[in-house]
Amino acid sequence: MATMLKVSLVLSLLGFLVIAVVTPSAANPFRKSVVLGGKSGVPNIRTNREIQQLGRYCVEQFNQQAQNEQGNIGSIAKTDTAISNPLQFSRVVSAQKQVVAGLKYYLRIEVTQPNGSTRMFDSVVVIQPWLHSKQLLGFTPVVSPVY
């Protein structure tokens, strides 16, 4: 009878430990901190070909949109340097992704401007692989803080 009680107690404790390790909680050291719908970092950005190609796509789309907007203004705008010398993609320097109705990427991209200087831009792009869709949502220059 005492042996049966010990076995029952050991099995109960073992079951409790298994549940404690498997159940996600803030106290669980094995749990990865992920917030549903939250942003997560993208590892190995420099060597990640998909992310670098996505950055190049963002710059190309921005250049195309700028060219289309300038072309709609009139013949004077067609001599603008933004059209004859568009931004050149250099590299993606940081990236985060978020699961939405697809994947939303937040990229910080280094570009070379027509005058040869480099500048950072933040871009947002959504990919929906099942629709074969990729859409640039935003492409804005990073403003350096003035101290």
From Swiss-Prot:
GO terms for cellular component: extracellular region. The lineage of its organism: Eukaryota, Viridiplantae, Streptophyta, Embryophyta, Tracheophyta. InterPro entries: Cystatin_dom (IPR000010), Cystatin_sf (IPR046350), Prot_inh_cystat_CS (IPR018073). It is found in: Secreted. A motif (Secondary area of contact) lies at residues 98-102. Residues 1-27 form the signal peptide. The record marks G37 as: Reactive site. PROSITE patterns: CYSTATIN (PS00287). Its main location: secreted. Belongs to the cystatin family. Phytocystatin subfamily. This is Cysteine proteinase inhibitor 2. The gene is CYS2. It comes from Arabidopsis thaliana (Mouse-ear cress). Residues 87-117 form the Cystatin domain. Glycans are attached at N115. GO terms for biological process: defense response. Keywords: Glycoprotein, Plant defense, Protease inhibitor, Secreted, Signal, Thiol protease inhibitor. Specific inhibitor of cysteine proteinases. Probably involved in the regulation of endogenous processes and in defense against pests and pathogens. GO terms for molecular function: cysteine-type endopeptidase inhibitor activity.
